[in-house]
C-alpha cells in the first residue's frame, strides 16, 4: 500500500476525494451501466454482445461476459424491520448493494435478500444502517494507496453502524470477507461478524439445515 500511496499523486488524491464525496452518485451510475449492459444482452444476444464486449475491451473498458450480474439496489429492496425482539444490523458490501444475479441464474434472488430471508426465518429483525448508499468500509481507497481517505470512509461507516446497533447493543453482519477484515482492523465499537460466522454462532440452533 505504501508504494501505491506514493504512486497515487495529487491526481489520485483528487479522484479519491471526489469518489468519497460522491459515492452515492457513483453507485447509481454503476447501476446504470449494468442496466445498459443487461439490456444490450437481451436485445443483441450472447454471441453478438460478447463480440462487442471484446472489441471495446481493447480500449480499456472492463470485459463483458454472459455472467455479468444485473443491476440491483439493496437500499430500495431491503428495509428495517419494526418492533422488538432479536435484532441484527446488516451491512451488505458495496458489490452486493449494486449487483444482483446474472441472467442465467436459477435463483433470481440477490444475496442481500437471501441473507435477510434467512435472518427472518431464524426470528431476527434486521436493521439497515442509514444512508447505506453513501457508506463503504474504505477498502477501495486503501487498495489505491489512499489511506487517509480510506480511514475517513471507515469512520463514517463505523458511526452509522454504531447508531444502527444502538451503540453496540446488536451484532453487525457484513457479507464480504475482505471488507470485514478491514472493518475488524479499524473498528472498535461494534460487534462484527461475517455471514457464515454469524450463522454458525447464532443461527444453527434456530434453523434446520438440509444438505442438497
Residue ranges and their predicted role:
Residues 2-212:
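Iron-sulfur cluster-binding electron-transfer modules in prokaryotic oxidoreductases
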Amino acid at each position: 500500500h505504501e508504494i501505491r500511496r506514493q504512486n497515487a499523486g495529487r491526481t489520485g488524491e483528487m479522484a479519491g476525494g471526489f469518489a468519497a464525496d460522491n459515492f452515492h452518485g457513483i453507485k447509481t451510475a454503476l447501476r446504470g451501466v449494468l442496466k445498459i449492459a443487461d439490456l444490450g444482452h437481451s436485445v443483441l444476444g450472447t454471441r453478438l454482445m460478447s463480440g462487442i464486449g471484446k472489441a471495446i475491451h481493447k480500449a480499456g473498458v472492463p470485459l463483458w461476459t454472459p455472467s455479468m450480474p444485473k443491476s440491483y439496489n439493496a437500499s430500495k429492496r431491503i428495509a428495517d424491520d419494526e418492533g422488538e425482539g432479536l435484532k441484527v444490523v446488516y451491512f451488505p458490501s458495496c458489490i452486493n448493494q449494486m449487483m444482483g444475479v446474472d441472467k442465467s441464474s436459477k435463483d433470481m434472488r440477490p444475496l442481500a435478500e437471501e441473507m435477510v430471508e434467512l435472518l427472518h426465518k431464524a426470528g431476527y429483525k434486521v436493521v439497515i444502517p442509514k444512508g447505506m448508499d453513501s457508506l463503504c468500509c474504505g477498502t477501495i481507497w486503501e487498495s489505491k494507496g489512499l489511506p487517509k481517505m480510506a480511514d475517513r470512509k471507515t469512520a463514517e461507516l463505523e458511526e452509522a453502524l454504531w447508531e444502527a446497533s444502538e451503540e453496540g447493543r446488536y451484532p453487525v453482519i457484513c457479507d464480504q470477507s475482505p471488507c470485514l477484515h478491514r472493518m475488524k482492523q479499524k473498528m472498535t465499537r461494534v460487534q462484527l461478524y461475517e455471514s457464515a460466522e454469524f450463522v454458525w454462532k447464532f443461527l444453527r440452533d434456530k434453523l434446520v439445515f438440509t444438505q442438497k
